[in-house]
Amino acid sequence: QRFLGAIGYAHGFFNLEFFYDDHDDCLRVIECNPRLASQFSDLYERVHGVDAHAMALTLALGADPQSLPRVRPTARAAASLVYRAFDANGDVPPAPAVPQREALARRFPDALLFSFAKMGRGRARDFRWTGSHRYGIVHLGGRDREDLRQRCEDASELLGWPAPYLDHGSLPARVHASAPSLSSLGEPSVEASAG
């Protein structure tokens, strides 16, 4: 809120990207984009029952987004899990095979899975530009934070991917993270993800 007030941002969607430095327990803002981060749009619907894209359009047209209909929320907490490899010389977990994808869909019907398997120059470019390779994203909802955490860990295990927030010795001291917010509607119960 202090940051948004300092830049004069009063309402609307924004995407705040920051670094967390565990050496001094400090957040450092990288950038603030005054727009909807589309990666997170389904999380708002899961938790608040709002269509974030319709809200953004309504705001752009100068209308009140509170007048839009809401759907019944399906979760009290939601997360966008971003799976990254930080060792350019290490192994990257393979993309889930069809049986794993089908098992994920059966066990977690609300899951959204994005797989970004890259090899060779594509992966090398990721490491050169970002210091990591994003090989997947999973969106899930849960009854509460604990249920969400358990579902995230179970889904990660099913896919053969380490849960991104657990210490596997592969995360750098600084972890890039981003989280969605609706400044005019209050904070959603959406988890920021190591991403």
Task: Please report, for each region that a protein language model flagged, where it lies by residue.
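A short beta-strand motif that forms the metal-chelation/ATP-contact edge
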Residues: 25-35
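Short coil/turn motifs at secondary-structure junctions
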Residues: 23, 37-39, 143
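Conserved protein-kinase catalytic-loop segment immediately C-terminal to the catalytic Asp
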Residues: 17-21
